[in-house]
């Protein structure tokens, strides 16, 4: 996806990003149901096959999620894509961690901008919604992206099924 975005002038329409990322979200819903977290979702880990089919790569950072979908993990940081809980080794991670990262991928794909780092956002949140940037996207999509990028994990979607539904309301 990173290379594709580079070729497309750094961003694509919401509709095209939805076509690319919906299958990835469905895959991640299944991954989470199996008790795994990816923990490294970013454009450079989404490969577009010649037929346009997206594939999620690099499960090297993935971990089993114990204790009702939550556990502690070593640091895995990708600036702009890592949620606050990945910066603190004592914080719990779960599906909400991957949801934040998917929100960041959507944001990057449609705005052409990598979201500010979560640590920077926790001091003064400079994140501007896609609609506020003047992009022509559905309000549901704008709300869903911003909800996924919420700094508080409890205010994000609980799972990818919920996130998909949020985009479709």
Name each model feature, range by range.
Residues 48-52:
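Activation-loop N-terminal segment of eukaryotic-like protein kinases
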Residues 25-36:
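Protein kinase catalytic-loop region centered on the HRD/HxD motif
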Residues 80-169:
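C-terminal lobe helix-coil module of Hanks-type protein kinase domains
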Residues 2-12:
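AlphaC helix of the protein kinase catalytic domain
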Residues 37, 42-43, 47:
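Canonical protein kinase catalytic loop motif
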Residues 54, 66-76:
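Regulatory activation segment
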Residues 20-21:
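Activation segment signature within eukaryotic-like protein kinase domains
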